[in-house]
């Protein structure tokens, strides 16, 4: 019997398993590897961390998110050193928004948390930023906060690999299968996988992302939200021209009728050997999946054509004259969380469910990749302290 089992081998689950395996020699981390080949033929679960680039930054309008990010980023060097796997790339990052004295604007709140936490940044008008970085254009009359230091992006695939490797080095058993059933009817929790295995654990952490509610059967207020991302392939010459590109988050002042805003990553080489600029945003009109099968169907598809067109338009507006080899759309899912009144909570859920020997850690709210180590640590600590 395991003392701890973590269900979900993603960013939060792998981080939690790394911490739990420091405290116990009876830990299992259960979750499938990334599907190979064409996603359209895959019948199992998916993970939005199957990617090469996620923005990492400390500046955030929420002090909680800023703290989780700051604490996670502080652990990146140790995780890279212990695993021998690099995943953190310092490119700097910008956030663009309204120039206003309103203390509750996104940028003003982000600037306050940066000052509280000692985050290094420079502040520009959009016109002044364009003079320094002429490749990138935002709307007139906006403010740009340019975070330096550790800001940039992480490779989420590599971060998961690093966390899993360290957990395994510390004695955790890695079970590369999908948990299909969680049975709490006994002195321990019984887990059954698609590979036919049955495992028992005293305490279980479910970190299954968008599938968490479907797997546990608990009503947790999780809202799996489909997103479309765009991958713009560029050649070596264009990548060289944009080699100083920071990550970009621009929501205030975009004024696009279809999407709320846009985030853009710098050129990154992907496993197919090509270099892409990845971007995403938030479509206003969303059809939410109501079941695990609908969620799987979304991942197997090609996303929203409306969202893809809007994203490509914004990319070419931010980087005028961008030369692309191809532009393709892919699917992603963000797991948000609402309270009993349907109001967006904006932070992850880390809480026990049922009889108390099962916990969940879910709802990354589209911002958890960079902060996943700290979120996983907090979940592991709470599970460890459960009695």
Indicate where each model-derived feature is located.
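N-terminal Rossmann-like FAD-binding beta1-loop-alpha1 element of flavoenzymes
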Residues: 2-29
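Short hydrophobic core segments
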Residues: 5-7, 30, 198-212, 376
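Active-site substrate-recognition segment that forms the wall
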Residues: 18-23, 84-90, 198, 203, ...
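Glycine-rich phosphate/pyrophosphate-binding beta-alpha loops
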Residues: 153, 358-372
